Amino acid sequence: MAIHMFQQLIDTLKKSPKRIVFTEGTDARILEASARLLAGTWLAPILIGNEAEVKAAAEEVGFNIRGAEIIDPATYPDMDKMVEEMVALRRGKMTADECRAALMKGNYFGTMLVKMGVADCLLGGATYSTADTVRPALQLIKTKPENKIVSSCFIMVREGVADNTVLAMGDCAINIDPTEDELVEIGLECAKCAKTFGIDPKVAYLSYSTKGSGKGDTVDKMRNACAKAKAAAPDLAIDGEMQFDAAVSPTVGQLKFPGSPVAGYANTFIFPNINAGNIGYKIAQRLGGFDAYGPILLGLNAPINDLSRGCNAQEVYSMAIITAALA
């Protein structure tokens, strides 16, 4: 765990405490992370589930969750109001009965708790699929007015003797083959996310080509997306298209892309598609010694994040802090 980065996030949360919903309140990993959070006063866990079952699950694995708020959809006093609001949000696509049935599930119920202001953010996916976490967010939280898509970013951290290396990579998890305009949005959102984690973003639009050395539709896509991103955010350091070696090696960057404000010093990487992105971040994780935090969902009106179903309690704890830091 990148202790320095997380301590900075915790210090920020201490100044403005948040409430986070966990959609799977009986999961042992969620309970362990919640017990750790309850030791502080800066991030209050809300566990969804039957109160007796949640407490029994915590007792079985030996975690003290005294003080945690537990909310059971089946006995929630404001359920009628929640159903009414969800019907309005779905705009005729779901009946009241269908909404009520959906709200008996932690993913929909938790998302509506965020929508109604009971919680500031949500973390799910310990047992739910990514689709089952993202779908309610798209339907109920929706994207920000300036955003057309939900995208994602991984924060990659490698601890060093003197300092940490912190990078941002997107989109490695959500958009399979983004268009030029979607890549513009992905780049700008990743840059915003990078700033939250102390990165001064230098954004590289990656390709197998550097400054026209290669030809093809994907090269054109990255070059055009980069040009549009630069026009949309002239104050950001953005450049491309470029190969990864030109992006990270000052020597290669100077040779292949002289005069670039990014080449050789990039720290925020935009991949042409999910294949490249997913492979890229996992190479950095498995061979480069980086810890990967994410996927962090970008573009929504409130922070909703997805865990890997193979996550451990430490990863739940870390992602809870990251999610709350974005609230």
Where do the language-model regions lie?
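Anion-binding alpha/beta catalytic cores of soluble intermediary-metabolism enzymes, centered on
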Residues: 1-263, 267-327
